[in-house]
Amino acid sequence: MGIARILSAVLFLSVLFVVTFPALLLADHHDGRIDTCRLPSDRGRCKASFERWYFNGRTCAKFIYGGCGGNGNKFPTEKACMKRCAKA
C-alpha cells in the first residue's frame, strides 16, 4: 500500500508539472496574461491596409495591419501602445 501511494503522488505531480509548466513559460510575470508586447508585429491574413502600432521591444512603431487575424501586439494609436507596453 505504501508503494501505491508513492506512485500515485508521483503521477499526480508529474501531470501537474506537464500542465502548468508551459503556461509559466508563456505568461507575463506581472499578471498571468500572455505578454502581448513581446510578440512580433503580425499583418494578419486579410489584405486591407490599416495603420496600427506595435511594440518592438524598445518603443512603439507603425505597421500595416490587414484587418483580421494577427496577434495582440497591435494598437490603434502610439499612445495606446506606449500605455500598455512601455515600462516606466
UniProtKB/Swiss-Prot annotation:
Q: Where does the record say this protein resides?
A: Secreted
PROSITE patterns membership: BPTI_KUNITZ_1, BPTI_KUNITZ_2
The signal peptide, as residue positions, is: 1-27
Q: Which residues form a coiled coil?
A: none
Is Signal given among the entry's keywords? yes
Q: Entry's SMART domains?
A: KU
> Which GO terms of type biological process are on file?
envenomation resulting in negative regulation of voltage-gated potassium channel activity in another organism
**Record keywords, A-Z:** Disulfide bond, Protease inhibitor, Secreted, Serine protease inhibitor, Signal
Query: Which residues form each disulfide bond in the chain?
Result: C37-C85, C46-C68, C60-C81
Q: Which family does it belong to?
A: Belongs to the venom Kunitz-type family. 02 (native) subfamily.
Q: What is this protein called?
A: Kunitz-type kappaPI-theraphotoxin-Hs1e
